[in-house]
Amino acid sequence: MPSHGERKNKDIECNIWNGIHDLECIWKYVQCNWDRIYLYACSIGAYFSLHAYKNRNIEKYLFLSPILDMDYLIHNMFSWFDVSENELKEKQKIETPIETLSWKYYQYVKDNPIKHWDIPTDIMYGSKDILQSIEIVRHFSMKFNCQLYIAKESEHSFMSDSDRKIVTDWIEGSI
């Protein structure tokens, strides 16, 4: 993903357009090499996948700590970092400790909500996730008939020793 892992210090913004571009490159490779495709995505990767792969022949999605409602997250960032919508519109981009807020990206989010999703999807959500509320995740799961698993005491990152087993068991039970 842009600005993640080995690309963390590269000059590539983590936004929907770069995310979709990367996922399209991956898709070209995957579709040529496999007949049955399952997708595993975490956090922002899940959000990008919802947009990049919505019309792709994928058997099942596995989303770990997915960002399902980017508008919700952006509004939380407005609150966390004392930024207003008008200020973002005026400045176009505002740096925060988490990520750069962009007016163009915000407009994309507002103009492109996920309205249709009919691909079988399993979601693992940590009860201590602060990036998406349980209400957001439950609403998405109910609206689009997804299987929702909630890990008590897990955070967005699922990085504790006990989380490894939770995630491994969930993946094995979902495929």
Which residues does each PLM region occupy?
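Gly/Ala-rich beta-loop-alpha elbow adjacent to hydrolase catalytic centers
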Residues: Y40-S49
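Alpha/beta-hydrolase active-site loop
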Residues: E13-C32
